[in-house]
Amino acid sequence: MRKTNMWFLERLRGSGENGAARGVGSEAGDKASKGPLYSNVLTPDKIPDFFIPPKLPSGPAEGEGQAALGPSTSEQNLASAAPRQTPRSPRLPAKLAAESKSLLKAATRHVIQIESAEDWLSEEATDADPQAQGAMSLPSVPKAQTSYGFAMLAESPHTRRKESLFHSEHGALAQVGSPGAGRRRAAAKANGGDGGPREAGGALMSPGRYFSGGESDTGSSAESSPFGSPLLSRSVSLLKGFAQDSQAKVSQLRHSVGRHGSLSADDSTPDASPGSRRRLTRRAPPEPGPESGQARGEHTVHVGPRGSVRLLAEYEAGQARLRVHLLAAEGLYDRLCDARSINCCVGLCLVPGKLQKQRSTIVKNSRRPVFNEDFFFDGLGPASVRKLALRIKVVNKGSSLKRDTLLGEKELPLTSLLPFL
């Protein structure tokens, strides 16, 4: 019995030792298995050595400085970890040192540039510009003396006048339009010079006089006169237009003088507006008749107890077309009617059958609406014109909630509108 107990105790002691050994082995295995999982965690024993490189020394002392400093621990680790890397070129530090030297010299260099006064004068001198030379010859242009003893323009004449003194493109205009141009041309001819180029701009003399009002009676010089400076390039076309207008007015005045034998005060100052020229050139329309090929007539049609419509009817037999020109409507609204509620509209059609219905535009806020519209009725032969009638219907258009109001209605035979048919 005693032997059995001792054997049992020995077995328990052996199993305990084996379990402890197994526990130590399992813990080591767990640590080995968990090690790679936390390898990215930075711990104090894993902090690497950092190295801040010094400034590159100048000259050949670079190798001595590196030898004095010695390799650091991080450099040793890198060298041991990557032995297969190619070594640095020995010429690279020298090249970097040379570049740093050149940069330092460029940064500390003070550049002093000396420009020649003659070069500045040749660029900025007044005599270099031919147009400025012409301005310098004018006594009316203010001038100033420079520190070198040269004369230059005190200010630009562009800021004083719209017509520039420096535009020499149409220099002949200044010589032709100036008051002393005739004297200069006479002197040139007396001296034997050719006055052809100066006479070439003589055709523009009348536009210049028309534009400025003629020769000045005052004793102003050619330089102080506006004609002493050349005009702009676009002024030539304007002067030509003025020349044509002036010639047309002269011909009209001559015609009026020959017709009446005298010139009144109103005829001496004709209106220069485009409308007046159109009125002067417009011919009176021929009187309608059987021989004119067209039948027309203007009528006032009463469409209600007090309202009326004025219109003009014209029939073209060659095209079989009737044209009705609606002029205006009168007497349709009284004074008590609110002008804001007026929306007048006229409708036209041919009866019987209500053929070719047409409607005018709506005229608002006017007690005497003016239309001035044309209405065309095509395909009407002479036989149809004698049978048909024109229906005129005047309506005041209502708003969104109101109905249209009939102001008047009238039917007229076309034979009554066309008396010469």
UniProtKB/Swiss-Prot annotation:
**Where do the C2 domain residues begin and end?**
305-421
Which one Pfam family would you cite for this protein? C2
Q: Where is the composition biased (Polar residues)?
A: 215-228
Phosphoprotein found in the keyword field? yes
Q: Which region ranges are annotated with the description Disordered?
A: 13-97, 119-140, 158-228, 250-303
Please give the InterPro entries that the UniProt record associates with this protein: C2_dom, C2_domain_sf, C2C4C/C2C4D
Q: What keywords are assigned to this protein?
A: Phosphoprotein
> Which protein, by its recorded name, is this?
C2 calcium-dependent domain-containing protein 4C
Q: Which organism is it from?
A: Homo sapiens
